[in-house]
Amino acid sequence: MPPILKLSEHDITEQRSRFFAAAVPAATLDQVKKELAKRKKKYHKARHHCWACRVRDDDGRLVEQARDDGEVGRPGMKLLELLRQNDLEGLLVVSRIFGGIKLGPGGVGRAFRAAALGALDTKGR
């Protein structure tokens, strides 16, 4: 399964909320943690940093993780599904800066997915 080869970013606006997505090369959980810390610092105004990763452990086994960071609509799982569908290893993260309008679980999930697809489509593989 191919890794994400280079950092690829994409952002969208949905009803004044900003969604900043990145497909990030990461081979280990330690790299995932470091990259997440960078994203949280870069987008410090974001209320949510949802992410999913597929990396290898020390024995070469595939490890999958996803986090919603308190966001509704299970965006972490939507991001993990995108990594699975594209058969990619690495980190997919989306940071949301709330714009004052609630999108509801369906709208939030769609917005996270659209932002992440944009990052993948900009050839981060």
Language-model segments: what does each one mean?
Residues 1-74:
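C-terminal regulatory domains involved in ligand/effector binding and gene-expression control
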Residues 30-37, 81, 110, 114:
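Solvent-exposed alpha-helical segments within well-ordered globular domains of core cellular machineries
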Residues 42, 82, 86, 118-123:
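Conserved, well-folded catalytic cores of nucleic-acid-processing
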Residues 45, 55-57, 74, 81, ...:
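Generic structural "secondary-structure junction" signal
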Residues 46-50, 75-79, 116-120:
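Glycine-rich loops and low-complexity Gly/Arg-rich segments
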Residues 64-101:
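Conserved interaction-surface patches within small, structured recognition/assembly domains
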